[in-house]
Design a protein with these regions (language model features):
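PLP-dependent amino-acid enzyme catalytic core
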Residues: 1-333
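The conserved cystathionine-beta-synthase
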Residues: 344-363, 370-371, 388, 408-427, ...
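Bateman (tandem CBS) regulatory domains
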Residues: 244, 327-343, 350, 395-407
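A short, polar/charged loop-to-alpha-helix boundary motif
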Residues: 381-400
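Short hydrophobic beta-strand motif reused across regulatory alpha/beta modules
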Residues: 370, 376-384, 437
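Residues at the N-termini of beta-strands
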Residues: 174, 247, 366, 401, ...
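Methionine-biased hydrophobic packing positions in alpha-helices, especially
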Residues: 50, 332-334, 339, 359, ...
């Protein structure tokens, strides 16, 4: 058994698995498990390559500070390696990234700066522009800039591509990739153009991104928005040689998330949202073929960073990505049903400190108060603030000291106007379904 001496030695040489329980048409579909890298994603390869090259060229000095703009996974790879090598790290991250990624980055010692995800390149709050400005202002800082760093595609040209070729004995008809920084596409294309020029490249692009437009028409318009993390752009990354892509598929958030969830259920592989996008496009490509082909795509990162989002049914419903059957009455308005175990509740004799802990744990702002299975009140953050004030001892008070009893009950068959009337009075409504809610 091999003994390793640094976590960085575990980067790369990831396993390849053939998928058997999804509809791949006449094709054989293989998934390279980049989620098995120590930082949990394909970006570990890129982070190691960029830091090694910066050290070699003298751009990064011992004890220096690295700055990067990242959707999360490059940051995790950089944080992992920076911690091993003794560098400080500042990461500028769009605010749509999952909490798990943010927690992981900070636990590795990175300083995380959140910025807006609703602005385009050129805006001062855009994450790449923000990172460049920080690097300019901080003496001795090195902006590693994965979007323009040739060591990014170099990682895939020297490791990912030859690994794939060896694992499949050189027989690869198509590779399905996504584009964030463009390094994976650019690096793989460069290597396969030399060693396997017949291999096709297929782009999996989130609906709303401009990259599929560029592939299909040679031009693009304003970007939309999407929830998938890590791939898709509102510009053409210079490292992504889009002209070498043979086909592109636009994948909606719903398709991406449901495909990733299906991958877990059928194949037992916990992968992230970008992996769902790639797999959905790969399945479309495979199903469109009339002759057998050997197709490869990637589990780009682990799904453990998305448990509070993509793998959370409540979050998926709130985003409109999964829906219940419509009943045609007020029960259609219920986001979380208590009879399905989906609500977090308090008891009248719980302490206010217990309520606050539950709000923080579940990231919610109010709780129904239940006694013998019946709602007797509601307690929210304002109730806590109003009753605690600056006196910490008051956290020991029971819920009944702070909750409001101004709750109105409606049968699910009541007219919508009755619900609107309750809201107009500033009250909380509980929808009853017989003896359930």
């Amino acid at each position: 058994m091999t003994i390793y001496h640094s976590v960085t030695e575990l980067i790369g040489r990831t396993p390849l698995i053939q998928l058997h329980k999804l509809d791949t048409g006449p094709c054989s579909l293989f998934l390279k498990l980049e989620n098995q890298n120590p930082g949990g994603s394909i970006k570990d390869r890129v982070a190691l390559s960029m830091i090694n090259e910066a050290e070699r060229t003298g751009q990064l000095q011992p004890g220096g500070t690295i700055i990067e703009a990242t959707a999360g996974n490059t940051g995790l790879g950089l944080a992992l390696i920076a911690a091993q090598k003794g560098y400080s790290l500042i990461l500028v991250v769009p605010d749509k990234m999952s909490r798990e990624k943010i927690f992981h980055l900070r636990a590795l010692g990175a300083q995380v700066v959140l910025t807006r995800s609703d602005v385009n390149k050129g805006h001062p709050a855009y994450y790449q522009d923000y990172a460049q400005r920080l690097a300019d202002e901080l003496p001795g800082a090195f902006y590693i800039d994965q979007f323009n760093n040739e060591a990014n595609p170099l990682a895939h040209r020297t490791t990912t591509a030859p690994e794939l070729y060896e694992q499949l004995d050189g027989r690869i008809d198509a590779i399905v990739v996504g584009v964030g920084s463009g390094g994976t596409l650019g690096g793989l294309q460069a290597w396969f153009a030399e060693h396997s020029p017949h291999t096709e490249f297929v782009l999996a692009d989130p609906a709303g991104s401009v990259l599929a437009d560029q592939v299909e028409t040679g031009r693009y318009h304003d970007a939309g928005s999407w929830l998938v993390e890590g791939i898709g752009e509102d510009f053409i990354p210079p490292l992504a040689h889009i002209e070498g892509v043979n086909r592109a598929w636009r994948i909606t958030d719903r398709e991406a998330f449901t495909t990733a969830r299906e991958l877990l259920k059928t194949e037992g592989i916990l992968a992230g949202s970008s992996s769902g996008t790639l797999l959905a496009a790969a399945l479309k490509y495979c199903q469109a073929q009339t002759a057998p082909k050997r197709v490869v795509t990637f589990a780009c990162d682990s799904g453990n960073k998305y448990l509070s989002k993509m793998f959370n049914d409540d979050w998926m419903r709130q985003q409109g990505l999964i829906t219940r059957p419509q009943a045609g009455d007020l029960s259609d308005y219920i986001a979380l049903r208590h009879d399905e175990g989906a609500t977090v509740t308090a008891a009248p004799d719980d302490t206010l400190s217990t309520v606050l802990a539950r709000m923080r744990l579940y990231d919610i702002s109010q709780l129904p108060v239940l006694e013998n299975g019946k709602v007797v009140g509601i307690i929210d953050e304002w109730d806590l603030l109003r009753h605690i004030g600056g006196d910490g001892d008051r956290f020991a008070l029971p819920v009944t000291a702070a909750m409001t009893r101004q709750v109105e009950f409606l049968d699910k068959h009541a007219p919508e106007s009755a619900l609107h009337a309750i809201f107009d009075r500033g009250l909380v409504a509980v929808i009853n379904d017989n003896d359930r809610f």
